[in-house]
């Protein structure tokens, strides 16, 4: 398994209480693929440096996880299919 960091920017029109269940829904893909979610850090509403899908701000969330590459690819695919997700970025942090 590899370590990944996933940043997701959600639609600012979502209610605060709807953010956590939405992220948990995405993370079920990781858990079903025998991956491990290490940390979920929701930063809240932040102003974007440029508009994405005509939205000037978004709800940022950073997820640290360990999973196989195919599981992370499926997670990214599921997130991109959801209309509440403005942008995703999957990174593999460097380990020294």
From Swiss-Prot:
Gene3D superfamilies, A to Z: 3.30.70.60
Keywords attached to this entry: Ribonucleoprotein, Ribosomal protein, RNA-binding, rRNA-binding
GO biological process, one term: translation
Pfam families: Ribosomal_S6
Cellular compartments per GO CC: cytoplasm; ribonucleoprotein complex; ribosome
Highest taxon in the source lineage: Bacteria
PROSITE patterns (alphabetical): RIBOSOMAL_S6
Disulfide bonds: none
PANTHER family assigned: MITOCHONDRIAL 28S RIBOSOMAL PROTEIN S6, SMALL RIBOSOMAL SUBUNIT PROTEIN BS6M
Name by which UniProt lists this protein: Small ribosomal subunit protein bS6
Species classification: Bacteria, Bacillati, Actinomycetota, Actinomycetes, Kitasatosporales
Protein's gene: rpsF
């Amino acid at each position: 398994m590899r370590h990944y960091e996933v940043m997701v920017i959600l639609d600012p029109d979502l209610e605060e209480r709807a953010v956590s269940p939405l992220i948990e829904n995405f993370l079920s893909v990781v858990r079903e693929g025998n991956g491990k979610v290490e940390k979920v850090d929701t930063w809240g509403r932040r102003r974007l440096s440029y508009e994405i899908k005509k939205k000037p701000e978004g709800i940022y969330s950073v997820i640290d996880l360990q999973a196989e590459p195919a599981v992370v690819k499926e997670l990214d695919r599921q997130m991109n299919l959801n209309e509440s997700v403005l942008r995703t970025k999957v990174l593999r942090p460097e380990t020294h």
